[in-house]
């Protein structure tokens, strides 16, 4: 999942990262490549031109990108893509944008989207902060979904967590009024931090009331991170905020 860096010296790649001759300078996340299968590598070659969006650092007209006018949903840090693929299968009236730096997960989702014949999904293999700041117009998104971001469970690492005040303010800017932000975590203290940050962010109101949570929505499939957490005895918190 997406892992933002603070200014505390966490190591990043010092030079551009190249995958299938597409160069990207990694700036603001920890790159975790994992095991990259031949099938996932082939997916980049075969399906990236169909579903992939290369970062150019310029604001985009999302209706032009998708070739139609439809509600736009962004998932930040889609992991292996299970939730995004499920949503695209079951809610085809939406256009979906996914952002993920974990290359094997991107490759797996590319294969799945091709298998499904999906038409209205676009993927970034890049840093979410850069994409949001430089390529997404303010107010362009109807919904943002962030499922099971890295909890950085050690207290000294909490400042590396994705959900921080500046990032929350960025999300508010990109959501249209009337849109919503949906987050899920299986770490109690991260849920507390999410409430602390989001309740203090102008432009967001918790749909379930102060420090409230909602049942798992129909649009979110259970992820492997959720199953892992449940096996460890963790609860899952679903937080849903409206953009006002």
Swiss-Prot record:
Family listed: Belongs to the class I-like SAM-binding methyltransferase superfamily. TrmB family.
Keywords for the protein's UniProt record, in alphabetical order: Methyltransferase, S-adenosyl-L-methionine, Transferase, tRNA processing
Cross-referenced Gene3D superfamilies: Vaccinia Virus protein VP39
GO annotation, cellular component aspect: tRNA methyltransferase complex
UniProt cross-references to Pfam families, sorted A to Z: Methyltransf_4
First-level EC class: transferase
Phosphoprotein is among the record's keywords: no
Residue sites binding substrate per the record: 154, 186, 223-226
Name this protein carries in UniProt: tRNA (guanine-N(7)-)-methyltransferase
Pathway: tRNA modification; N(7)-methylguanine-tRNA biosynthesis
InterPro entries the record matches: SAM-dependent_MTases_sf (IPR029063), tRNA_(Gua-N-7)_MeTrfase_Trmb (IPR003358), tRNA_methyltr_TrmB_bact (IPR055361)
EC number(s) reported in the record: 2.1.1.33
Catalytic residues (UniProt): 150
Signal peptide coordinates: none
Reaction catalyzed: guanosine(46) in tRNA + S-adenosyl-L-methionine = N(7)-methylguanosine(46) in tRNA + S-adenosyl-L-homocysteine
Any GO MF annotation of the entry: tRNA (guanine(46)-N7)-methyltransferase activity
UniProt-annotated binding residues for S-adenosyl-L-methionine: 75, 100, 127, 150
């Amino acid at each position: 999942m997406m892992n933002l860096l603070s200014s505390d010296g966490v190591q990043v790649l010092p030079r551009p990262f190249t995958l299938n001759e597409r160069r990207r300078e990694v700036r603001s996340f920890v790159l975790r490549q994992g095991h990259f299968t031949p099938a996932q590598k082939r997916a980049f070659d075969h399906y990236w031109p169909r579903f992939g969006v290369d970062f150019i650092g310029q604001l985009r007209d999302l209706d032009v990108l998708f070739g139609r006018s439809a509600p736009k949903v962004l998932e930040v840090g889609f992991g292996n893509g299970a939730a995004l693929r499920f949503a695209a299968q079951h809610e085809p009236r939406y256009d979906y944008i996914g952002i993920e730096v974990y290359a094997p997960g991107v490759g797996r989702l590319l294969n799945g989207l091709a298998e499904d014949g999906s038409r209205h999904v676009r993927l970034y293999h890049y840093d979410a902060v850069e994409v949001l700041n430089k390529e997404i117009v303010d107010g362009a998104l109807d919904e943002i979904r962030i499922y099971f971001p890295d909890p950085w469970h050690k207290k000294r690492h909490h400042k590396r967590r994705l959900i921080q005040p500046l990032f929350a303010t960025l999300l508010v800017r990109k959501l249209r009024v009337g849109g919503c932000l949906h987050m899920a975590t299986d770490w109690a203290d991260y849920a507390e931090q999410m409430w602390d940050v989001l309740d203090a962010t102008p432009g967001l109101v918790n749909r379930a009331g102060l420090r409230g949570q909602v049942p798992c929505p129909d649009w979110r499939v259970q992820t492997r991170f959720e199953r892992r957490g449940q096996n460890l005895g963790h609860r899952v918190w679903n937080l849903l905020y409206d953009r006002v």
